[in-house]
Amino acid sequence: MAKIRVYELAKKLNMTNKALLTKLKAMNIEAKSHMSSLEDDTEARVRESLHGMKNKQADTRVKSSVIRRRRPPKPEPSVTELPDDEAAGSNGAAEEKITTPGPVTGDEMTETSTPAPVKSKIPLKAQTDSTNRPTPEDPVVKATELKPKKVTKPKSSPARVILRPDTPAKEEPTKAKEVPAAKEVPAAKEAPKVKETSKAVNVSEDEVNPLPTKNVELNSGDSKPDGALEEKSETDEKALEKEPTIKQEDTILEDNHARKEVRSVAVDDDDKNLDTAEAKDKKRKKKKVQKRSEPAKIIKMAVPISVRSRNKVKTEATQAPTSPQRPKVHPKPADKGPARAQAHRPDTGRDAVVLPGEGDGEVKRSKKKEWKKKGVGGPGVEFAPKGAPRKRKSVVEGKDLYEKGRSGKKGRRKDGRVKKTKTMKTQITVPKAIKRRIKIDEVIELSELAKRMGIKANEMIVKLMGMGVMATVNQTIDFDTACLVAAEFDYEVEKASVEEDIVLQVQEAEIDPDKLVSRPPVVTIMGHVDHGKTSLLDVIRKSKVATGEAGGITQHIGAYRVKTKKGTITFLDTPGHAAFTSMRSRGAQVTDLVVLVVAADDGVMPQTIEAINHSKAANVPVVVAVNKMDKPGADPDKVMRELSEHGLLAEDWGGDVIFAKVSAKTGKGIDGLLEMILLQSEVLELKANPDSPATGHVVEARLDAGRGPVATILVNQGTLKAGQPVVCGLYSGKIRVMIDDMGDDVEFAGPSTPVEIVGLSGVPEAGDEFVALDSEKDAKQVSDSRMQKQRAKVLAKRSRANLEKLFESMGADEIKELKLIIKADVHGSLEALNDSIMKLAQDEVDITIVHSGTGAINESDVSLAAVSDAIIIGFNVRPTPKVRSMAKDENVDMRFYDIIYNVINDIKAAITGLMPSTFHEVIIGRAEVRDTFVIPHKGLTIGGSFVLEGKIARGFKVRLLRDGVVKCDSTLSSLRRFKDDVKEVAHGYECGIGIERYNDIKIGDIFECYEIEERKAQVEQIKE
C-alpha cells in the first residue's frame, strides 16, 4: 500500500504542516512530525473530514446569539474574536484547514470565520441600499463574490484557537449575496493574482459577517461569483462605470467614537433595531479599549477584492452616503480621523476564534499618524495601494535585494513574482593619467607588473608573445621589456627613484679645496707567480709574510701600512696566480700606483702581461721592479726588452716608466724603489678630506668563527670611526671593532689606511664600496634596498637560464653533473675558486656549485651535501670532529686543500672520470691477396697475401676491401706462414689468411687489420 508523507499531504491540501498535524491529532491519528508517513485510508479520512466540514459551512450561518456569548470583559474562551494584533502576528497563517475548491458549509464558516458576527434582523435593505451594500469606507470583503476555488496557503504560523462555536447557526445561503464587499486596496490591474493575507476583524454586537475569511487568490480577471452572486456583481460593475471616484467625506463616519474603536463592520439585512445596535456598539468600544494590549501590526495590509465588489461598493456609497444606519467603521485611515481599516479579516483556520486585545487605542492613533505622513487616504484614493507592499509575504533571497526592477508594478509579472533583470557587465574603469605611470626597479615579475597595471596576467602574456617574448606568470622581465609591454596598455614605466641614492647623496659633501690634505699613496704589488712579490714586501715591512703562505704563494690580498723615512706607504699584495685575475683587477682599481715585479731570470710571463693590462685599464701609473738580481742568470735587459713590446718603455730607453733593480733576498735596491714610489706619488698630488664622511673599498672579507663577518677595508676619503654605521655592499652594520695591519685596536682610520672591521650583518664581496652614514636606520634601509634588487636579479637570471637550458636539453642526451659545495677562509679565495672551477666545465659534464661561502664547514653544509649529492671542498678551512662524524654517517665526501693548484687538478680528474670515453680505430696492418686456395674438407677459402704495411695479427678485427668497398668485416679464422700457425706476420712477409664465415676472396682484395681503442677524455692539468 502506498504511503504519503505529512508534508506532502499538507501541500496537496494547501495547509501548513503544523495545521495538518493539529488536525491529525484532533482525529486521533498518530503523526510525530511532518516526515511521518500516512496510509491511503488515513489520507482519505483527512480529506473527508476537511471537505465535509466545508460543505456544511455553505448551508449554515452564525446567529447573533453566538456573538453575544463571546463578549465578556476579559479575554475568556467564550469570546469569539481575535484582535488585529493577534491576527497580525499570525499574518494570515491561521488558515490551518485550507480545503480544495468547493462549497463552504455553515459549520466551517462558523469555526474559521470567527470574526464574522451574526447579521441583525434590521430591515436595512428596505430603508436604504447603503445599509446592505458597503460604502467606500466599508472594508468588509464580500467573500462569496470571490472565487473560492483558488486557495493559497499563507506562509506564517496559524492563529491560536480560542473557541469553537458549539452550535453554529443556520441561515439561508441566499443571504450571502447581500454581504457588503470589503474595501479594495490594490486594484485588480495593479496586483493581479495577489494572495490575500486577511486581517483580524472586530465584531460589533449587532453586526455579523456571514462569510468565512479565507485566503483567496483575488484576480479581477479570473474571479467569478457562484450562483446568484454573479448577477449582483454584474450590476455593481455597471454602477462603477457611472461613478469612478468617491469623495473623501464619504469615507468618514459621523460618529467619532465609532471611527476610533470599531474594528470590523458587516451590514445585515436582518430585522434589528438600530438604536439597540448603536447602544451596544458604544458598550463594546469601551471594552476593547481596555483589553487591547498589542498593536495591529498588519493594519496597513488590505484585502484585495474583485472589480465587481469594488463597483458595488462605489454604487451603494453614492446612493446613501450619509445614512445613519451605515456601519460605524471606516475602511482606511482618513486625513483627519483616527479611524482604521475595518474589513481586514484574519487568516484564521477552522478552529480559530478572534480574541479582542487590550490597550490598542494609542497604537491606533500612532498608526494613523504614520499613514497621514505617508499621504494615505486622500480624496479619490479610498482604495489606495497602501497595503500593496505587504499584501503578500514571500521569501526573498539576499541576491534579490540588489537586483534592479524588484519594486513597483512594472517589475512584476502576472503571477506576482518579480522579473529578473539582466545584470550589467562590470565596466573597466580607466585610471587617471597620473595613475598610469608605474615605477619599477631594474627587473620585475610579470604578475607583479600586471597587478600594478590592473590588468590580467594572461593579457600581458599574450602581448609579450606577440612581441616575440615567451614568458610565464612568475617569470621576471627587465626594464626595457616592461616599458614595451606597458606601452601596449597605455601605461608609462619609469625607474623607481632609488632611495639609497637619496640617502647617500646627503652624505656626500662638496669637496672643499681648503680642507684637502696630502694622503699616503696606495701601492699594489703585482706580477707573475713566484716572481718574489711577497718576499719584496716582507723586506719592506721587515716581516715574514711569505714564509706563512701555503705553498709559498699568496692566495688573497693583504693590505699593509709601511712607514719610511720619507713618508708612509700603503701596500696591497695581490696573488700572482692565474686564478686570481679578479683580485688583481680589484687591486688595480683601488690603488694609486702599481709596482710590477718581474724576475730577472724568468722575464715576462702571462700574469705579468695580465697585470700590465689591468694597470692600463685602471689608468694607473706603473713602476717596474726587476727582482732576483742576485741570481747568476739574471738578465735585466731582457726584461726591459720584453716589457717594451707591451708598451712599458724604460726611462733609460727614452720612455716614462721607472725601472728599479732590486733583490728581495739581499735587500739591494729597496731604498731606491721606495724613493721612486714616493716621487711618483708627489707627481700625482694625492689629497683627501679627512673631515668628510668616510668612503672606501672592501679589499678582502671573510667569516671568522669567533667574531663573525670580518672585512678588510681601505679608506679613500674621510675618517672612519669605531661605532659608526656603515654600508658595505649588500650588508650594513655598526662598527664594533677596528684593527690595523699590525693587529692593534684603533678608534679611527684616516685616508689611505687599511683596517679590519667587525660588526657587519654579512660577509661583503671583495671590491664592494663602503660608506659611513649618520643613522643606523638609514644604513639598514640602503642595505634592504640593495638586497631586494639583488634577489630580483638572481631570480631573473635563474629564470632565463632555466628556459635556455630547457630548450637546449630538448632532444639531447642526459648531461652528467658534478655538484660542489665550496667553503674558503676569505672571500677573495672563494671567488677565485669559483671562477677557476666554472671554467673547467665541459660539454659532457656540467659543474654546479650548490653553495659557496666563507667560514668553517658546518653541519648545514653536510646536510645540504647529503641531500644534493655534492662534494664538499674546504680551502684553508677544517671541520670540527662533530661535523666529520656527521659526514661519515651521511656518506658525504669532503676534501681539504691549502693550495689552489691541487683543488683545480682534482676537479679536473673528477670531470675526466665523469666524461664519456671516446673510441678510435687504429689500423694495425694491410695485406694484399696474391692468390687463393680452397680447402675442400673444411669449405674454406684461403687468401695467399703479402703484408704491405704494419702487421697482421690474431685477435684483431679484419675487414676485406675490394676496390675500396668493404665486403666483409669479421675476425681472422686462420693465419699461417707456410704450414705453421703464427701469431702475427710482419711487414714484407707472405702468409695465408682465412676469414670466419666468408669465402668470397678474390685476387687483388685487401685485408685490413685494425682494433678499436678506447680513449678517456683529458682535461689539461695546471702545472704546479
From Swiss-Prot:
Belongs to the TRAFAC class translation factor GTPase superfamily. Classic translation factor GTPase family. IF-2 subfamily. It is found in: Cytoplasm. Pfam families: EF-G_D2, GTP_EFTU, IF-2, IF2_N. GO terms for molecular function: GTP binding; GTPase activity; translation initiation factor activity. Residues 663-665 are annotated as: G5. This is Translation initiation factor IF-2. Residues 33-425 are annotated as: Disordered. InterPro entries: EF-G-like_DII, IF2_II, IF2_N, P-loop_NTPase, Small_GTP-bd, T_Tr_GTP-bd_dom, TF_IF2_bacterial-like, TIF_IF2. GTP binds at residues 527-534, 573-577, 627-630. Residues 518-687 form the tr-type G domain. The keyword Membrane does not apply. Residues 365-375, 407-423 have a biased composition (Basic residues). Its main location: cytoplasm. HAMAP family: IF_2_B. Residues 573-576 are annotated as: G3. Residues 43-62, 135-148, 167-198, 223-263, 332-350, 394-406 have a biased composition (Basic and acidic residues).
